[in-house]
Amino acid sequence: MYICFFFSTFVAQMGNIIQYIIEFLLYGNQEAANLVGYTSAESDWEKYRVVVVPNGQLGKNIVVPDLSDVYIETITHDGDERRFVIHTDIIYNTFFFISRAEELINPQRDDHGRFLAQYSILGENNRLMIPTVDEYARLLMKLLGLQLPTPSFSQIYLTHDIDSIANYRHLRGAIGGLMRGQWRAVFSSQRDIHNDPAFTFSWLIKQDKKIEGAKCIYFVKDTAGKGYDYPQYNLAGKDFAMVKQLLENSDAQIGWHGSYYGGKVIGPARLHRSHYLRCSIDQMQNLADMGVTEDFTMMFPDHVGFRLQTTRAVRWINPKTMSLTNLVLHPLTVMDCTLSNSQYMNLNEDEAYFECQRLIEKVYQNAGELVLLWHNTIITNEGYHRSLYPKLLNLLTETTHE
């Protein structure tokens, strides 16, 4: 009896996952989803306008998907009625990418325990800049005779991780500044936090207001400040109170910036991004179990591109348990330090702008979400990010008014 119960539960789970993926590919069109079948039984093909033939792996094994050209067979019924049979399992392939299943069969990780683009089949096959899942969606919609989504941004998120409020308001930062001979900067910061080079919140708020309708989120830490979580800042202290007041006055939202080492959620946090973009599948399930409903971590730290192979927010499917969770993944489009850091892409400003332009165009053409991450600590007079960020915001304005 128990075996029958668990089997029926698993079958129901699989049915929910398949239905969700089909509806996701059709941009939520439930009526059109009923015209799509996922079956290898030829006797059932006549029930559907489009049939996707399973590769037999979904819910059984995790295998590397076939990324060659999609093979479509056209069948004519009663002389003129046509149906299409897709012999490439785009349902499984979609599952593989949006669930992060590749990480279960590829053990490679960097020193921070992260799965990098260079380890992925996406990096190996130069497909990082191609949202394959959205291409499947467009193909399916064309076969069903549906209108393709109008180019647009379904939402723009301008996000900022507050790894540190100030450079010189904590002991190690102040001592380091003094040892480097930056006496004036240190004492100026001690007198007034607004003078600290990392206290760039007013500037960020002013820039972000250029994008009408954008949602602005600042992810804050509540950690012991040890190791890679250093430096600590006190959420009950007066320095953070200044930041919080600025953010509240600007109508920005506050999310939880998860510890490098994992940990509890700050209060009733709904929005989350992991520090160092470090979030394993088990950690992601912990987030779902703790009540986090929206995550903004999903990007490879070492290269920009579409880690989930979609430009759109998607509910996470746990590939270990084959369960459809309520945790929504918002694909991160661009992170500042990925562009400029020498251990990552190491681009100059013109090269970085070009790569961002390519990504923004892909998101716009697929009516996806655009999510930018710029740290308050990187917007200084050093480097090019204080120049690049406004240029990208201007590009967004131009794109939305085309």
Which residues make up each language-model segment?
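Terminal accessory/targeting
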Residues: 1-234, 312, 319, 323-402
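A subset of signal/propeptide-processing and intrinsically disordered low-complexity segments
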Residues: 156, 252, 290, 297-300, ...
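Metal-dependent polysaccharide deacetylase catalytic core of the NodB/CE4 family, i.e.
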Residues: 164-168, 202-283, 298, 304, ...
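Short, structured secondary-structure boundary patches
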Residues: 238-240, 268-270, 292, 313-321
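Short, conserved, surface-exposed binding loops centered on an aromatic residue
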Residues: 246-247, 285-286, 316-322
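Histidine/acidic-residue-rich catalytic or RNA/ligand-binding cores of hydrolases
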Residues: 264, 281-286, 306-311, 382-390
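His/Asp/Glu-enriched short active-site or ligand-binding loop at hydrolase and phosphoryl-transfer sites
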Residues: 291-318, 334-338
